[in-house]
Amino acid sequence: MAKRDFYEVLGVERGASEGDLKKAYRRLAMKYHPDRNPGDKESEDKFKEANEAYEVLSDTSKRAAYDQYGHAGVDPSMGGGGAGFGGANFSDIFGDVFSDFFGGGRGGSRSGGAQRGSDLRYTLELNLEEAVRGTTVSIRVPTLVNCKPCDGSGAKKGSTPSTCPTCGGIGQVRMQQGFFAVQQTCPRCHGQGKIITDPCNSCHGEGRVEEYKTLSVKVPAGVDTGDRIRLSGEGEAGTHGGPTGDLYVVINVREHDIFQRDGKHLYCEVPISYTDAALGGELEVPTLDGRVKLKIPEGTQTGKQFRLRGKGVAPVRGGAAGDLLCRVAVETPVNLSRRQRELLEELRDSLEGDSSHSPKASGWFEGVKRFFGDL
């Protein structure tokens, strides 16, 4: 099959600049790279074709020979004096291509050996009192710890791991992708460079075993839902001598029967009787420090809010404590006796027609009258 024109392959004009060539090649390399099209023979062929075209056109002397003689000027098999593909340097192109494939620039090769253990997360349920005052709790956490019989090596006591025959102890293997070679983690030793021929009976060569660890956690006063306590070195054990991960204890404060919390402030609803609301009085309300007396002025309405300063929560990072805000809810009397009913009827009759006793209701009814009068 006759070769396509190299300019046509890259989709550029014959006078294209070096920058245009690079841009066109990079687009095709990204589109047809074998890593993005595994098992696709057509994409692999187009990838090779783009490689060949860019290798020639990006080289000044080869491009001149190609422009004058066509494929014969760069392909020895066609009688020209081309130099094959050994001299091409695509590192500047693939620095960008690999960055797009793997989400970053070309860093150092992944080496085998010690690896840090994973961090763990534990959700700790607390009641409001524990969260506000602080506490110390014991928790039991499932984790991975170093195997004691083999000291975390994975090999049976007295034996030693052998060098991986696949990668020769490097931990990586060289994979050919068309005209290019890339380094990949060795599939046999998983980047460790060594394999265990006589595994430990306790951990079966893993070097770590599952275990429940009991820990004491000191919870500072003032924590709230979502706060985290870090226990350094209490996560999963690392592999092959790597450092241990951390344990993050995440706080979740359960709902309280009386109080609702918003940051450093507490809120509660206080039911009061119809008579206390009308005549005024004094009642006891709960706080986290005990009961306090709250004075209710006469004529108190539902929704009235009273602030008890400093009766909220002291922030975990320091500062003044918040407040307790008590919202009054006036209860309508129920299950009335005959005498109680008579008294309320007498009260209603005595209040009827006097708007000074119910200014809000009077104003509302006046507004309703005006509304219907305007219709």
From Swiss-Prot:
GO terms for molecular function: ATP binding; heat shock protein binding; unfolded protein binding; zinc ion binding. Keywords: Chaperone, Cytoplasm, DNA replication, Metal-binding, Repeat, Stress response, Zinc, Zinc-finger. Residues 5-70 form the J domain. Binds 2 Zn(2+) ions per monomer. A zinc finger (CR-type) spans 134-212. Zn(2+) 1 binds at C147, C150, C200, C203. Zn(2+) 2 binds at C164, C167, C186, C189. Its cofactor is Zn(2+). GO terms for biological process: chaperone cofactor-dependent protein refolding; DNA replication; protein refolding; response to heat. CXXCXGXG motif repeats lie at residues 147-154, 164-171, 186-193, 200-207. Pfam families: DnaJ, DnaJ_C, DnaJ_CXXCXGXG. It is found in: Cytoplasm. Its main location: cytoplasm. It comes from the Bacteria. GO terms for cellular component: cytoplasm. Participates actively in the response to hyperosmotic and heat shock by preventing the aggregation of stress-denatured proteins and by disaggregating proteins, also in an autonomous, DnaK-independent fashion. Unfolded proteins bind initially to DnaJ; upon interaction with the DnaJ-bound protein, DnaK hydrolyzes its bound ATP, resulting in the formation of a stable complex. GrpE releases ADP from DnaK; ATP binding to DnaK triggers the release of the substrate protein, thus completing the reaction cycle. Homodimer. The J domain is necessary and sufficient to stimulate DnaK ATPase activity. Zinc center 1 plays an important role in the autonomous, DnaK-independent chaperone activity of DnaJ. Zinc center 2 is essential for interaction with DnaK and for DnaJ activity. HAMAP family: DnaJ. This is Chaperone protein DnaJ. It comes from Pseudomonas entomophila (strain L48). The lineage of its organism: Bacteria, Pseudomonadati, Pseudomonadota, Gammaproteobacteria, Pseudomonadales.
